[in-house]
Amino acid sequence: MAGKGNPVPGPHLNGFPVPTYSYFFPHMLGSLSPPALPGLPISGYSTPSPATIETQSTSSEEIVPSPPSPPPPPRVYKPCFVCQDKSSGYHYGVSACEGCKGFFRRSIQKNMVYTCHREKNCIINKVTRNRCQYCRLQKCLEVGMSKESVRNDRNKKKKDEKKPECIENYVLSPDTEQMINRVRKAHQETFPSLCQLGKYTTTNSSERRVALDVDLWDKFSELSTKCIIKTVEFAKQLPGFVTLTIADQITLLKAACLDILILRICTRYTPEQDTMTFSDGLTLNRTQMHNAGFGPLTDLVFAFANQLLPLEMDDAETGLLSAICLLCGDRQDLEQAEKVDILQEPLLEALKIYVRRRRPHKPHMFPKMLMKITDLRSISAKGAERVITLKMEIPGSMPPLIQEMLENSEGLESGATGSRPSGAPPGSCSPSLSPSSAQSSPPTQSP
């Protein structure tokens, strides 16, 4: 008990001053603290908090800086599972290079349909991966690339966008408007519309289907040759096309020529008479088209023409869709596939803006148009096979330009044109691309 007049001593526990605990057992104070004694005031100090004591107990250690940790070694991925090229990481479930990642993504997003012109067992490696798109896609799937991952990735991007249809401003920039006008002009100069033509008909084999009407074939092959030349003229007017290597220009024309020919003739379909009209005005019904050389393609082409009717495409849209068909980086044997894709991007954007400005209440019209490219490719693959069988049916030889431009469509083996060095003379592969032949050839009309 403290004497009278003496200061009241600090609180004690079992005869020891409390503060001594902070020095004898600092490691225990994080969980233990002495109980407060009721009625005894605390003078001159307060019990240190566990955080303060912890700081005191470790302050000496913090004075000495720890050595910096070494940077982690660069991550090394296994070679691309598809082509064995250097991998850039794991994409869609497997280790893959940028090329195979992009090829797989485009193939799934665009629902591409490929055809193998060999035995569906092509070797896919760094050198051969662009030669057969069918086998390359199959290899992507075999090694474990996931279609669902592509779709999920696309859906995620869509969700991240805040209602794009509400906030997108479909205003044509001056550059985009200039591009649309340029493509429209190129299309109109190489393909007159139906309303500009004076129709005429023929009675040749109009009643029943036959294997081949030679007179109709002669006329049809003449018009088709002119149409191919006009397609080349159209291509040369597209932004950036002539900046590609000559080899790539020829590869793209061979791959897309039949797509463009079918798209064009189908825009001249008259459903009331079930007829199609060529650029000289010749109008053939379904039976005559069959007998002129279309054969088993006839019903496919007429069905496609019927599918185009609800789209009500004008010259700008037909020209842009033709240009998109042509400038497609997925074509096999391209030397500069990435450059082709870069040329295609502004065409896609121009078509999207133009279509949605023209039809503001039909937001699905643009994707519907793009889906027609898949239909065209499917018909064209059968069309290239039809050119081969025609050679056995016609009495004479196949017109050289038709054979060169259509038979070799997307890799049918009639000469390895796609592998020709880019420095080779243009005329050595395609007369229509040769400047000399372009100057000497008379003005033509396309079918």
Swiss-Prot record:
GO terms for molecular function: nuclear glucocorticoid receptor binding; nuclear receptor activity; RNA polymerase II cis-regulatory region sequence-specific DNA binding; zinc ion binding. Residues 80-145 bind DNA. Coiled coil: none annotated. One of its GO terms (biological process) is cellular response to corticotropin-releasing hormone stimulus. Residues 47-61 have a biased composition (Polar residues). The keyword Zinc applies. Pfam families: Hormone_recep, zf-C4. One of its GO terms (cellular component) is nucleus. Residues 175-409 form the NR LBD domain. It is found in: Nucleus. A motif (9aaTAD) lies at residues 400-408. Residues 146-174 are annotated as: Hinge. Keywords: DNA-binding, Metal-binding, Nucleus, Receptor, Transcription, Transcription regulation, Zinc, Zinc-finger. Residues 47-72, 407-447 are annotated as: Disordered. Its main location: nucleus. Residues 414-447 have a biased composition (Low complexity). Composed of three domains: a modulating N-terminal domain, a DNA-binding domain and a C-terminal ligand-binding domain. The 9aaTAD motif is a transactivation domain present in a large number of yeast and animal transcription factors. PANTHER family: NUCLEAR HORMONE RECEPTOR, RETINOIC ACID RECEPTOR ALPHA. This is Retinoic acid receptor alpha.
